[in-house]
Amino acid sequence: MPTINQLVKTNRKAKTWKTKAPALNRGVNSLKKKVTKVSAPQKRGVCTRVATMTPKKPNSALRKYARVRLTNGMEVNAYIPGEGHNLQEHSVVLIRGGRVKDLPGVRYHIIRGTLDTQAVNNRKQSRSLYGAKRPKK
């Protein structure tokens, strides 16, 4: 605990924190070729590689992910949620923040049902997360 005199001399410093999705907080001014700080909920990008990865220790699967080059020039790994996908190299996708706990280095999710990404077929529950339309009665 600091003394009163120490607090009078220097105030308490607010704790600094690091963002968990840095690619969403970076923009590029292509005319001036400068990096700018923008806060975006999503970013668009082009898939450079679509592959599978095995998860960390207690889990076992082949999780699908894509390496995406974003409009701000960064390359990130993004998880492809849901069963089955139509993504391949040069597909245009929209990513959002949100890590996958058992995949190291994957801090983003691809949004299903937008741009070149198709929605998950035959999805009845949690449809909005997978871009699925409401089924006809």
Swiss-Prot record:
Keywords: Methylation, Ribonucleoprotein, Ribosomal protein, RNA-binding, rRNA-binding, tRNA-binding. One of its GO terms (biological process) is translation. It holds the Pfam family Ribosom_S12_S23. CDD domains: Ribosomal_S12. InterPro entries: NA-bd_OB-fold, Ribosomal_uS12, Ribosomal_uS12_bac. GO terms for cellular component: small ribosomal subunit. PROSITE patterns: RIBOSOMAL_S12. The modification 3-methylthioaspartic acid is found at residue 102. GO terms for molecular function: rRNA binding; structural constituent of ribosome; tRNA binding. Belongs to the universal ribosomal protein uS12 family. Part of the 30S ribosomal subunit. Contacts proteins S8 and S17. May interact with IF1 in the 30S initiation complex. With S4 and S5 plays an important role in translational accuracy. Interacts with and stabilizes bases of the 16S rRNA that are involved in tRNA selection in the A site and with the mRNA backbone. Located at the interface of the 30S and 50S subunits, it traverses the body of the 30S subunit contacting proteins on the other side and probably holding the rRNA structure together. The combined cluster of proteins S8, S12 and S17 appears to hold together the shoulder and platform of the 30S subunit. This is Small ribosomal subunit protein uS12. It comes from Mesoplasma florum (strain ATCC 33453 / NBRC 100688 / NCTC 11704 / L1). The gene is rpsL.
